[in-house]
Amino acid sequence: MKHKLKITILSILFGLLFGIPVYADSNTYIIDQSDVLGEYISTLNEKAETISEEAGLRITCMITNTTEGMGTPAVSEQVYKGLFADDPGFMLIYSIDDQEWFIYSSGMESAPLTEEQENELWNEFAIQDYYVDCVDAYLDAAG
């Protein structure tokens, strides 16, 4: 318990230090800092929670405008650990302004998606801006 609290506090401090807002609880699976998911956020969050419970993993996603120069790997690890410590699972992160995405893996040896699925997601995110469909497809593939 102390370890989880320590990681949460450190993650919040790093988030404040580097300007990356970290504000979510452990029941939040979809973080939409860019407000591109709109009315679909609660439905996607419920779906992610259900898939996570069924799989015994944390399946999460974060969309942000920018990583403030930290990069998607660093931000996804920071946010994931702040929410779930070392629980096994995955986090898809996409930075709109940076045109960069990454799938962070905690306690797992492989990513939940095939290379073909990753390419399809990238096309939807970066080229077509189908954010809701992309997050939904990620959840389906990860589950």
Q: What residues fall within each predicted segment?
A:
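A structural boundary signal for the start of the first folded domain, especially the loop/turn
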Residues: 2-143
